């Protein structure tokens, strides 16, 4: 058994078959997008069906962009989310207010670019359950681009550092079956998040790519475990 296990979040699912396949693959989490301009947006009625199909042991994440507490609460009236992901310009106070109102843990996404002070950002959002790092693009949502992983503070990457020295990192941004092993080897994230890397077209998931991505993560974890035990 590998000593390192990278959690897997498959994001932007829109179809029941996508969710069924994600569950069958053993994904730890799925992501549902509640940002209407996104091609991966799902209305609450469809989202409720998708969330129910995930079952009790898969985290159902709701992605919101600058939504109000009332907007999020209205979604929760119909959709059994278990985690919130704030992907806009929300302040720490706004995140805490919204999450407190609906009683759910939350992640804060950051679109990384040169000059971004990740340590300062992590300190501001210390109440989050994790920090999701994505590539910077104009507008909101993922653009399928990989950001420069050397921008991640080196103290967060040290395997000898205590867990309290770094936030739980959820690595996103242009990941695919072709590059996720390298990402895991370099960054050792708590989790990886993928959307465009498992699509045949924008908003259309591809089961073969989903399978290949999960397999690549598992193989990378196994390789890390073998290197630790050697």
From Swiss-Prot:
Pathway: Amino-acid biosynthesis; L-tryptophan biosynthesis; L-tryptophan from chorismate: step 3/5
Keywords for the protein's UniProt record, in alphabetical order: Amino-acid biosynthesis, Aromatic amino acid biosynthesis, Isomerase, Tryptophan biosynthesis
Coiled-coil residue spans: none
Keyword Iron-sulfur applies: no
InterPro entries (UniProt xref): Aldolase_TIM (IPR013785), PRAI_dom (IPR001240), RibuloseP-bd_barrel (IPR011060), TrpF_fam (IPR044643)
GO biological process, one term: L-tryptophan biosynthetic process
Enzyme class: isomerase
A family per Pfam: PRAI
EC assignment: 5.3.1.24
Catalytic activity: N-(5-phospho-beta-D-ribosyl)anthranilate = 1-(2-carboxyphenylamino)-1-deoxy-D-ribulose 5-phosphate
GO molecular function: phosphoribosylanthranilate isomerase activity
Assigned protein family: Belongs to the TrpF family.
NCBIfam families: PRK01222.1-4, PRK01222.1-6
Name of the protein in its database record: N-(5'-phosphoribosyl)anthranilate isomerase
Record organism: Ralstonia nicotianae (strain ATCC BAA-1114 / GMI1000)
Gene that this polypeptide is encoded by: trpF
């Amino acid at each position: 058994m590998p000593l390192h296990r990278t959690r897997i979040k498959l994001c932007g699912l829109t179809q029941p078959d996508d969710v069924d396949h994600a569950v069958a693959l053993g994904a730890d989490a799925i992501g549902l997008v509640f940002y209407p301009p996104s091609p991966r947006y799902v209305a609450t009625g469809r989202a409720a069906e998708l969330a129910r199909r995930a079952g009790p042991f898969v985290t159902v994440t709701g992605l919101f962009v600058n939504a109000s507490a009332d907007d999020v609460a209205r979604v929760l009236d119909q959709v059994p989310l278990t985690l919130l992901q704030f992907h806009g310009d929300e302040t720490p106070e706004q995140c805490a207010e919204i999450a407190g109102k609906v009683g759910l843990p939350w992640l804060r996404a950051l679109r990384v670019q040169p000059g971004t002070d990740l340590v300062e950002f992590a300190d501001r959002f210390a109440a989050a359950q994790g920090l999701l790092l994505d590539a910077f693009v104009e507008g909101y949502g993922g653009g399928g681009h990989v950001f420069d992983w050397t921008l991640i503070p080196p103290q967060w990457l040290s395997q000898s550092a205590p867990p309290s020295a770094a936030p739980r990192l959820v690595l996103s941004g242009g990941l695919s079956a072709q590059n996720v092993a390298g990402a895991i080897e370099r960054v050792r994230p708590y989790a990886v998040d993928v959307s465009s890397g498992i699509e045949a077209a924008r908003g259309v998931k591809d089961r073969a790519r989903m399978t290949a991505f999960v397999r690549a993560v598992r193989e990378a974890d196994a390789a890390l475990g073998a290197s630790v035990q050697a």
